[in-house]
Design a protein with these regions (language model features):
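Mid-domain alpha/beta scaffold segments of enzyme catalytic cores
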Residues: 1-105
Length: 105
């Protein structure tokens, strides 16, 4: 079984090991990046719409550049308080980066 998108926790790690589940761990910050590197997990990296800002995007640029997959990215007009214009700009920049580096989203 494969989980296409999860966020790391000890509980999830235990279940994955117990049931032989593999997956793509979503990284949203440097601390999570260090964790997936230590655990040798396959991962994606992206600025989630809830955290969308140019500052966040700039701080995550090195992680995005080195990630095998760009994600979890997008836009959220229902559950998110971040202005849609900002979300759109951050989303588009991540798509442009993925295209320039030939990475899947």
């Amino acid at each position: 079984m494969h989980d296409a998108h999860y966020h790391y926790s000890k509980e999830i790690n235990t279940l994955q090991n117990e049931y032989g589940i593999s997956g793509i761990c979503n990284v949203a910050n440097e601390k999570e990046f260090e964790l997936v590197q230590q655990k040798h997990l396959f991962y994606s990296c992206g600025v989630h719409p809830w955290n969308a800002s140019l500052d966040t995007l700039n701080s995550m640029f090195p992680l995005l550049k080195n990630a095998p997959i760009i994600g979890e990215i997008g836009m959220d007009s229902v559950w998110c308080d971040v202005d849609l214009k900002i979300q759109k700009e951050v989303f588009e920049k991540q798509l442009q980066l993925a295209q320039a580096l030939n990475k899947p989203v």
